[in-house]
């Protein structure tokens, strides 16, 4: 054994051992030392036995003791060598660990340097965009101050505001309002389209707890319009779910629904429909064909087909969703009524009015039984049914439904219907009768203004829409005075709480005179179901305004001064060139009129204000 140990030292003097060779030699020497230690231990035990025998016989005891001492010293040296070898091995292991940590830290430093450079570039770009935005904001603030002053003059153009809003509603793509996504509905049904996404529900399939935080984050980004963040976040989460849970897991279907919702908000209906088809196949295979989540996915897919104008393809999907919900929830569940509303709207776009009436009437009966007559869904469904009646020319049935909506809203607000508290439509018809029985020269027939003024309180967008639609129906019947009463009430309710000047001027305008206007609404219709409030009626009418709105001479002087100041301001903001008509910022009607060099002079008596006529013609 000693020869083995000594043999390890017979290396050339000029040769340098590597770390691996040193470690190998150290392990080999350690094994040799352990063997030598075992041999010495055995010899020492033998000598101890010999000493015991010699003590009994009394022979050469000293020599044996000397051998034992030598063996003990050798064993101590061997143990020292073993401990040193163990220290060397532990040190080598520690150095290896430190080296690997050092390599990791170097890689992390390189990555952080790259990220720091990227952040510096992003910061520089953001600072440039911020500088441009601040310049634009400063320019817009100057124009805003001027337009705020112009807005105060437009209190005389309230009729023009009403016409502009209705023309805008008629030109709007109705499909954006026709099909609210089922995932946007909550119990109150009062969220707008941007806010509805933030309250997204999964229609019978609750989002798993581990996905809820991610879902809320994605919806928040989508509501802010930050799709460049929401879409990659959804895709990354979808890839992680597919890798960990498999493509056929229900959570993957939930994530596909969320991504489809984001694409839907971006008007990418094809991509959203593709994702919903994948989610539908997953849910059918994992949850069963009759699960409520399958019904929700079918409904959302039908919604997307409807937005693309594929009503025939959407109808069987919606019909199947209705059958599932009737089977799972029962025929009188509110979700069944929502599905009936969707199916009715699809049939309405295909001209199947008998089916539309049947579905709306059944949905209305469910809402009244399950939620009560005061639930907002009841008023919305009645509004949609009335729109269907109007399309078929059933004006008396539509008028009855509109009056029921307004009467119910009045009862909720005032508690009863009596001589002191009448619904707004009763006031409108009374004013119509008074306008026919009295001539305008005999005096102002609106001394009772305060009575119907109190009935104008409207707290629901559905009621506001009903006011406009019933007013349109009155105009078609030639009841111009009643129509204007309802339209003024609807306009007041839209401005209530947002335009204090308009609130204080309603009574003054009615006291000065009753300016009627010629109105014409486009052929398009817009109805919101399952949480929508808009219902623009497809009605055309024309009326000859006999009232006049006198303008004072001081207002003409103000407009002369305003013309000069506005021209200077526009030249200052945009140079010598005039503002193009296609500007993204909507200008005040009065300013548009003043900047036209060939505009006709102001008339002293007309049904519509000059600024409103110009605004309507330019749009």
Curated annotation (Swiss-Prot):
Region feature Disordered, mapped onto this chain: 156-200, 571-619
TPR repeat residue intervals: 55-88, 211-244, 253-286, 295-328, 337-370, 379-412, 464-497
Biased composition (Basic and acidic residues): 156-175
Sequence ranges of Acidic residues compositional bias: 179-188
Gene3D superfamilies recorded: 1.10.287.2610, Tetratricopeptide repeat domain
GO molecular function terms listed in the Swiss-Prot or TrEMBL record: kinesin binding
Phosphoserine PTM sites in chain numbering: 174, 460, 565-566, 590
Gene Ontology biological process terms from the UniProt entry: microtubule-based movement
Xref: PROSITE patterns: KINESIN_LIGHT, TPR, TPR_REGION
Comp. bias regions, Low complexity: 609-619
InterPro entries the UniProt entry points to: Kinesin_light (IPR002151), Kinesin_light_repeat (IPR015792), TPR-like_helical_dom_sf (IPR011990), TPR_rpt (IPR019734)
Positions of modified residues (N-acetylserine): 2
Keyword Coiled coil: yes
Highest taxon listed in the record's lineage: Eukaryota
Predominant cellular place of this UniProt entry's protein: cytoplasm
Recorded coiled-coil stretches: 32-150
UniProt GO cellular component terms: cytoplasm; kinesin complex; microtubule
Localization per Swiss-Prot or TrEMBL: Cytoplasm, Cytoskeleton
Family membership: Belongs to the kinesin light chain family.
Purpose: Kinesin is a microtubule-associated force-producing protein that may play a role in organelle transport. The light chain may function in coupling of cargo to the heavy chain or in the modulation of its ATPase activity.
Subunit text: Oligomeric complex composed of two heavy chains and two light chains.
Protein name per its UniProtKB record: Kinesin light chain 4
Native species: Rattus norvegicus (Rat)
């Amino acid at each position: 054994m000693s020869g083995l140990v000594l043999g390890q030292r017979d290396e050339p003097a000029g040769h340098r051992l590597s770390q691996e060779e040193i470690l190998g030699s150290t392990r080999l020497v350690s094994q040799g030392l352990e063997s030598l230690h075992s041999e010495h231990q055995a010899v020492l035990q033998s000598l101890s036995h010999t000493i015991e025998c010699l003590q009994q016989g009394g022979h050469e005891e000293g020599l044996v003791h000397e051998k034992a001492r030598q063996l003990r010293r050798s064993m101590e040296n061997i143990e020292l060598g073993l401990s040193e070898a163990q220290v060397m091995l532990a040190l080598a292991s520690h150095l290896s660990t430190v080296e690997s940590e050092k390599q990791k830290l170097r890689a992390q430093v390189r990555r952080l340097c790259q990220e720091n450079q990227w952040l510096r570039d992003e910061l520089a770009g953001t600072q440039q965009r911020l500088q441009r935005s601040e310049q634009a904001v400063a320019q817009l603030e100057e124009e805003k101050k001027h337009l705020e002053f112009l807005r105060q003059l437009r209190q005389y153009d309230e009729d023009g505001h009403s016409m502009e809003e209705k023309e805008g509603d008629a030109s709007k793509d109705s499909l954006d309002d026709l099909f609210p996504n089922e995932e946007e509905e909550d119990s109150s049904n009062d969220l707008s389209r941007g806010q509805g996404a933030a309250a997204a529900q999964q229609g019978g399939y609750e989002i798993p707890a581990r996905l809820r935080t991610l879902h809320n984050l994605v919806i928040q980004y989508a509501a802010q319009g930050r799709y460049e963040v929401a879409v990659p976040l959804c895709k990354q989460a979808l890839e992680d779910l597919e890798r960990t849970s498999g493509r056929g897991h229900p959570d993957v279907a939930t994530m596909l629904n969320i991504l489809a919702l984001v694409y839907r908000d971006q008007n990418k209906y094809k991509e959203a429909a593709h994702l919903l088809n994948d989610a539908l196949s997953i849910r059918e295979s994992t949850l069963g064909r009759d699960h409520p989540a399958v019904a929700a996915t079918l409904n959302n897919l039908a919604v997307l087909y409807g937005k693309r104008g594929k009503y025939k393809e959407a109808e069987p999907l919606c019909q199947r969703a209705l059958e599932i919900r009737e089977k799972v929830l029962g025929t009188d569940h509110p979700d069944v009524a929502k599905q009936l509303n969707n199916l009715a709207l699809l049939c309405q776009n295909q001209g199947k009015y008998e089916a539309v009436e049947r579905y709306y009437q059944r949905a209305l009966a469910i809402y009244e039984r399950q939620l009560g007559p005061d639930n907002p869904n009841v008023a919305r469904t009645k509004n949609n049914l009335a729109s269907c009646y109007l399309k078929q020319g059933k004006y008396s049935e539509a008028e009855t439904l509109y009056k029921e909506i307004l009467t119910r809203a009045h009862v909720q607000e005032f508690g009863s219907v009596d001589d002191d508290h009448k619904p707004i439509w009763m006031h409108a018809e009374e004013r119509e009768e008074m306008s026919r029985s009295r001539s305008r020269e005999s005096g102002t027939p609106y001394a009772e203004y305060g009575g119907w003024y109190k009935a104008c309180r409207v707290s629901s967008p559905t009621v506001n829409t009903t006011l406009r639609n019933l007013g349109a129906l009155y105009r078609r019947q030639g009841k111009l005075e009643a129509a204007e009463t309802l339209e003024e009430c609807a306009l007041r309710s839209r401005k209530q709480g947002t335009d204090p000047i308009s609130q204080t001027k309603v009574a003054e305008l009615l006291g000065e005179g009753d300016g009627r206007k010629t109105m014409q609404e486009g052929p398009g219709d817009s109805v919101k179901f399952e949480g929508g409030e808009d219902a623009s009626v497809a009605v055309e009418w024309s009326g000859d305004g006999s009232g006049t709105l006198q303008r004072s001479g001081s207002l003409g002087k103000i407009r002369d001064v305003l013309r000069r100041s506005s021209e200077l301001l526009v030249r200052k903001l945009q140079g010598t060139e005039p503002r193009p008509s296609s500007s993204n910022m909507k200008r005040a009607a009065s300013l548009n009129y003043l900047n036209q060099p060939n505009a006709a002079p102001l008339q002293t008596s007309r049904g519509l204000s000059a600024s409103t006529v110009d605004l309507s013609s330019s749009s």
